[in-house]
């Protein structure tokens, strides 16, 4: 009996943990037969009367096993004792019926058929191996042509196609000297006779000799496929099926419905069709039927096998009775509903429930209210266990009964079971890791789950009918992880930006704001109190108002660095509300943090300060108390919304009238032809935009201030206590823009296509809209809803792609030892500090010692984490750049190292080994996606106003420094004219810290000197915003060349002034003959001797070429001096580009798509000159210092940023336009690329006020750069132009260099996130992402091996993920596979390594248990 049980146990528990990798390959016919338990010969399924499977049919019990456990089909052998007996009557083995899920069968095909995946999945693998086109192969396979398999002694070629007539003619001519076949036999013959080794040698030879790029590409592709066959030992002819495997019947079930009908899987229909045709073909072959009939049958067989494998891939899809295409094997695994995404990655789990959520303000932060009935159901097994342990029930059945009848003792046991047993709450959509958090359940009556108000922000939950799911962690380890890692009170910070996410919102903010506001001349003003208690009594007895400024003694607790506490009592002059609030301050925070009106931002800062100074525990308690206080006071305040609160500004009518007059004036100008219709529209939109702003300002001034009489009887203004104003001002709800619609004017509205309607809505909701205004309003409202729906889908898809590209990036070691990093500076744009240095380096590890600039001593050592204190120190020393380690420079091969990542933002300390930083980065970028806009902005009206700046002034006092590559010349008037393309001027403070930075355009006039002190508000430089000058750097006499009126230039006469100017015209508009083709007007300069002036240090003449549209301002023979303007280019030519904004822009950046009109970067460093123009293109030549010249053709309509004789650096912009990230990587390197992508992505998020830490974007960029292209293979196994994982190349190079051979040379390549996900080494991960068929086809041919490195692959094979606490499991598993046995103590030590903050009580339980 014992051995029997042991056997049974073995049968149910196969040791699935023994494998380390999964390989995929093609199965040979013998392999398929070896899997099979018998051949399916008949298309029958189940006998409709007896419901028993037909013999030799698709559900045959003899092949697949018994239908009932331990019972043969005819019923002769029943029960366990006959285990393993094969019944002699019906031939069925007596065993478990679940073998019907795993036993396969096969069908012997009468004629070989091609596997459609290898035929049709582009590029066709069959075509590649045979070097034939897909069209040709199809003609052979579907019996339209013969193919020569063995030419013998004839002049025919192997693989040549012959039509029917050709074939008959050749047979006449050569008899049977040659073999030509049709259908899959022909292709199989070709594949069998293919000598892979020989072909590879031939191809390598061809690759050496050929020069054409296209051929190299074609050959290397084919070479790759053939080498894959060679390495994997897979024979090419296995792509042709001779035996078809049959899926186990329980995976394609047939279920009898009532009424004699059956519900069946589509696969059964597809198999039936194959079997029918196969049997018919066998019979025809036996009968020696005419060739044409056999051929037709073979073609039909090929088609039916095609649709079984991948229906609809070729021709029309096979349909069932209801005209719906049948679901083939390929459809089973691909797409959202396929095996990968539906069953392997997203399983449904037991011990879970869902219900509506309601607010639970009485809960502590780590609690949630769980309905009793739900808890009873969820914790059933625990209750059964307890009932048995206590001896209240002897069997499970009895326990079940007790629970179902809900006996009183059950409730007591439930209380006990639930104590200290966390449950996990999840709200869909789970966009980041805070969408699932653990709570300790508190039993409540009713049927709704109660949720703590402060976690609503993280869940993005509200109580308008949202539902949440509850999950119960079962094992002790799971409970411990839930408690230490997921408990709501352990997740105070947001992993996206390291700021608190447990922040009060809505009513709480309103209550706290109301409590901390100050009022003039309110009850009890000026009173003095000995302590808060006394003040409270005065308040309760109505002698004192919350807003009164009083004098009161407050107790503060000071905490020293060593943790000693001392109380200190100080007298403060503050408001009553703030004094009451001071009672709940955590020890260690001074009262000054509270002594202001608390708006939402302030409260967030307050919680942040508490977390940094007082630690997690105090902060959680503090947040809870803040919440209670806020709710209480919001109730007390009784703030409501009343019609009277919406004050319409008094000046509104005047402002609107003035705007109407302006619009009339512009309409008059338009009718008299002074402005075009476009200009008129833009101006009108502009005027109304301004008017709306003025009305809004007047309204806010009126709402925000009110007149009151103070104690001394004077009238003073105070901040208003208007309900609506308070709601917006505190940040509780609403915004200035919404109040503006309520009480100002609604302003301009957009049509559905995004264009702005020029007649605004001048009324507001308070006054009411008329029919037309209401109708116009509906446009915008409806578009908003449509936009939101679109946005959600798009944002979700972006997140999915991001997660997929980064899912295997985990912190795998503590320090990779690199000294590399990026130099971080404050981000300054348009003279304003957008992001100070402290925000950019906080939580990073510095790569070099930070040195005090004055004393030159090291203040922070390289390799130390820059926390708040370190950053404060750096700021105080006036250091304006720090080199920090980044994810992009990390040298860890697989994964990242902790030092290069820095601080784990969600925990506030150095990141742990095992943290899945890739997924966190993806979530942090994807989660705010729904807040981004979807539309592209057309620059016009309002947006273009800002563009026409004509100068910069300093915003702060300091010292001027020139930055960038500032070059300037002084002209005759002594003005400094800038002749550099990327000049910048910086204003630094006394400490030398950069305060502002401004970009200056070419041709601007500098008004300050380098190193000069300036005050705030001083003009630094001016320029004409509407034209771009061309300035001469040399003096001399102007000599025109190719300046012919009517040929290259035209005379323009200004109607108003009557002056004439020469305008350079395009060759197409030229009037004279062909002589002037390709000639461009230019100016040369002559010196006193009449010789051409040379460029300094060379023997090239100075020649300034004018581009089309330039206005030449000098005359022939005129004397010019340095810095004079030769020509002006009107700036209308820079067309207003549509700016892609919001979500599409982020997707575009991460997909690394080259922009439409990309700018051109200089490929080399050298001097620019212009060659002869060809049709429609201008020729730009860059001559390097050693004299090598490189030509570039640039379309005429493009705006060239450089001029003749200018020196450009490699990677500098020479043709205007948005940058192409691939060019940046190639010419400027990784750092420049990272900067570009980070800045661009951050710009989009910053516009919406979303904060994301740079390191998340760096992590994504690292994954986009993880592949390289081989330039020169050296002695490695790679092929030139091949794309490989960087880590793979490095490993291979290490191996080769160790043998003293030549390593492979490679260059970085940037892949978009979709491409990067699909080209990952793990085929399982790629297949579960997108294009499943293609990925699997490719992997099968190459015999790929998946080492199960990433998170996704491990989820799919059903293991713990190799991140976090799962890392220990994987390490142990590997050790055990290597034969070491590790005890439980070891596992415990590992666990503590990964989960640092395990509470003591838990650890005792675990060690005891």
From Swiss-Prot:
Ubl conjugation keyword on record: no
UniProt: Mg(2+) binding residues: 462, 464, 466
Name listed for the protein in its UniProt record: DNA-directed RNA polymerase subunit beta'
UniProt similarity note: Belongs to the RNA polymerase beta' chain family.
Function per UniProt: DNA-dependent RNA polymerase catalyzes the transcription of DNA into RNA using the four ribonucleoside triphosphates as substrates.
NCBIfam families associated with the record: rpoC_TIGR
Positions contributing to Zn(2+) 1 binding: 72, 74, 87, 90
